[in-house]
Structures are given as structure tokens and as C-alpha cells.
Amino acid sequence: KEPMTTQTVFDMASCSKTLSTAVCTWILVERGKIRLSDAVNVYIPEFQNWVSEDGKEKKTIRVADLLTHTSGLPSYGPTAQLEEQYGSPNPEGLMKYISTCKRRFKPQTDCSYSCLNFITLQNIIEKVSGQTLREFARENLFDVLGMNFTDYLPTVRDKKGNWVNTSDAHWAKLVEGDWHD
């Protein structure tokens, strides 16, 4: 076991939703590039709004609904089905699924944690900024705050391997892979 330092690298995992994706969204809101009241399909035209089972009632899903987990999107996508259908990894296939999947509830009537909300926000950030979320966060957030060891793919910035396992289980090990949130 080694002592932790200011250069120790942790996996942010789902903390990246609030510490990066939400903050990057707010940066673009502050710059007038995104409006919280806008429908998601303003930025992702194929994104479908909520429609009641009988088709008589409709409700727009807004950017604000994604940030507050009130969109009605499911928590996760059917990973195995999506890999079989589109291959893995396939961000375009995932967004096709998110854009058309069944909504769990009418927007703004309930709250349910959803990774799909923040994957959708990632896509909005990338379309509006013309950069990947990783590039935008690094340039407009991490570097501005002097967070030199913060990144979505830390091995690119820190090849020293100064990593902390997030678990001390016998099976725990460092796993490098694609990020989705």
C-alpha cells in the first residue's frame, strides 16, 4: 500500500455526471449555446418526446429534465442487445436506442436515476461545442481549474500508473476501457 498524494488518480465513474458533464452543460448555458428549457430534439432531431400509451397526451423532454433525472428515460440500455445489434462500442447505435426507447414515465412527474440522461447530455455538448466531451471538459473545466490529473482517460495524461483501486476485494484490479458517462 502506498500513501495517497495530490497526483493519485481515482476513477470518477458516475461522479463524472455532476463533476464534469453537468458543469460542462452549465458552461454552455452560461455562454448562451444551450437553454435548459429547450427540447432535447432541438439538438438531437431524432430524439422522441414522451407520448402516452393511448397517444392522446404528449410532453416535451427538455435539457433540464436530463440534468434532473426527470426525463422518463430508463436507467440503462440493454447492453447485450445493443452490442448484438450495433457492435461494441457504438455510440451512434446507443443514441438511436436512447432517442426512440420507451420512456418510463411522463417527464417532470417523477425522478429516476438514468445514465442515459447524461449520455444524451454528452451528445448535446459535443454537437454544440464541436468537441468531444473529453476535449471540452479538459479545455473549459479541468485545465482552467488546474486539475492536471483529471481526465476521462487519465492514462493519456498520466502514464505513471499512480492509480487507486476503488475496491480492495480479492478480484479487484485496474480496468481500463471506454467511458460512457
Description of each model-found segment:
Residues K1-M12, K33, N49-W50, K96-T100:
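Short, conserved catalytic-motif segment at the N-terminal edge
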Residues D11-S37, F118-E126:
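Active-site SXXK
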Residues V23-V29, I44, L67-P74:
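Generic hydrophobic/packing signal
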Residues L36-S52, V144-L145:
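Short, glycine/proline-biased beta-turn/loop segments that scaffold the active-site neighborhood
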Residues V51-D181:
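Short, surface-exposed loop or secondary-structure junction motifs
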